Amino acid sequence: MKHLLILISILLLSSPVIGNSHKGETLYLWETSSGSLWKGFGDKDTQPKYQGQVKDGKPNGLGVIIYTNGSKYVGGWENGKYQGQGTYTKPDGTKYIGSWKIIGGVSSHWNGEYYDEDGIIKYKWVNGKLIKQYKT
């Protein structure tokens, strides 16, 4: 819960995505035969939609992405990938709150907790390793 309050405070105070100062840029994630591409146009019903800070045509800084299945990530980005503090929420209400680290070109859980739909901690990661699975 402490991490959630800190993250919300940081985003509300400093984020052009959520703050009133500037909305940021909009990008859409396109899946192609040669990989994923970020483009400035798309359809939110068929492509994930990103709103936030952008550098070199990719999410970089603070931003929000909403996937077509209803999942949502709010937090830090680097070169189009989750990096730093963030929250990934699934449509069923389960979520990961913590930090992400890019390893081998892939964003991975780093330090954080995974919560069930009732807000109860189910898993904990430290330095990229799952260290605890909580019993219910």
Model-derived regions, located:
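Glycine/tyrosine- and acidic-biased, solvent-exposed loop/turn segments at the edges of beta-strands
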Residues: S14-T136
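Sec-dependent N-terminal signal peptides
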Residues: L4-L13
